[in-house]
Amino acid sequence: MLNGLWLGFFIVAAVSALVQWLVGGNAGIFAAMVESIFAMAKLSVEVMVLLFGTLTLWLGFLRIAEKAGIVEWLAKVLGPLFLRLMPEVPPGHPAIGLITLNFAANGLGLDNAATPIGLKAIKALQELNPSDTIASNAQILFLVLNASSLTLLPVTIFMYRAQQGAPDPTLVFLPILLATSCSTIVGFLAVAFMQRLRVWDPVVLAYLIPGALLLGGFMALLGTLSATALAGLSSILGNVTLFGLIMLFLIIGAMRKVKVYEAFVEGAKEGFDVAKNLLPYLVAMLCAVGVLRASGALDFGLDGIRHLVEWAGWDTRFVDALPTAMVKPFSGSAARAMLIETMKTSGVDSFPALVAATIQGSTETTFYVLAVYFGAVGIQRARHAVGCALLAELAGVLGAIGVCYWFFG
C-alpha cells in the first residue's frame, strides 16, 4: 500500500506538471517541483533534530515509569478491554499501558509527549508481530486511532485565532470536539469492520459507556465556561498535566527504590536509537508530498470540487476552507499555513475561516503519522491502515463542515 501510494504521488505530480507546461505554458513548474524535493529533504532533517531531543527526553521518563510499575498497572486495569480489541496482545503486556498514555497525551494536546510514547507503544506491539514488514491488526488499530486526531483541548487552534485578532478565540471549541469525535468513531468502526472486532461485547461496552459519559460530562462542564476562562483552563490544564506526569513518574519511581537518574539515561539512549532510524522514511514521504503540492495537483482538485458544488446548487462557502483539508493529511505545517491564509483573506471569524479552523483541529497529518510510526519499526506493508485512516480523515472533514453549518449557519 505505501509503495503504491508513494509512487502514485510522483505520477500524479508528473501528470499535473505536464498539463501545466503543455497547456498552460508554465515552464517553471518543474523548477518549483525540484526545489520542493530539496526543501523537503532539508525539512526532514530539521524535524529529526526536534525528534531527537523530544524522543530522548520522553523515553527517558518512560523508562522510569516502566521500572516503577506504572505501565504494568495500566496494562492490568485495561487488559480485559484490549483483550477484545487487540486479541493478539496478551493481558498485562506493557504495550497496553503505553497505548493508554499515548491516547491521554493526544487528548490533552501534549504532542511532544504523545509521539515518543506512541513510538514506544508501536515498538512494543512489533515485538508481538510475527512479520517484520507487515503491519499487525493491533498496530493498525493503534495507528488509525492516532491518525483520527484524538483531541479534547485544541489549544493551538485558539492560539492561531487569537494571533489573527479573533474576539473569541475559543469559538470553535465545541465544533472541534464534535468533529474530532466523528473522525475517531469512524476510524474505530472502520478498523472494527475490517478486523471483525466484537464492538458490542459486554466487556467493551462496560469500558466505553462510562468513558463516553465522563467525556460528555467534561464537555458539558467546559461548555458552561466563558471564552476567557476556557482559554485559561486549556493552557493551565495542559502544562500542569505535562509537568504533573513527569513528577508522578519520578515520585513513584523514588518510592519504589528505582534509581531514577540511571533509568532516565538508559531510556534516553533508546530514544536516540529510535530517532535515527526514522530519517529515511521521513525523507521519502515528505519529498513525495512536497512534489505533489508543488505540482499544482491539489489546486486542480479544489477547482473541480468548487465546480461540482456549484453544479449541484449547494452553498459554496465551505469550499474556501478546503485547502486546509486537502493538505492536512500530507503536511501539518502546510495546513497551518492554509488556515492562516484563509483567516487573513476571508476574515478570522468568516465562515470559511471557522470551517478551516475546525478542520485543522479535528484532523491529523495521516501520512506523517504513517511514516513516523511504521518507519520506527520497519513496517512496509500497511494493509488496511491507510484506507481506514483516510476514511477517519474524511469523516473529520465532513463532520467539521456539517457542525460549522449547524453552529454558524
Where do the language-model regions lie?
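Membrane-embedded alpha-helical segments and adjacent helix-loop junctions characteristic
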Residues: 30-127, 256-345
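C-terminal transmembrane helix pair
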Residues: 113-114, 121-162, 166-196, 322-409
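Short glycine/serine/threonine-biased micro-segments
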Residues: 11, 58, 67, 107, ...
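Signature of multi-pass transmembrane helix bundles
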Residues: 1-53, 159-292, 311, 384-409
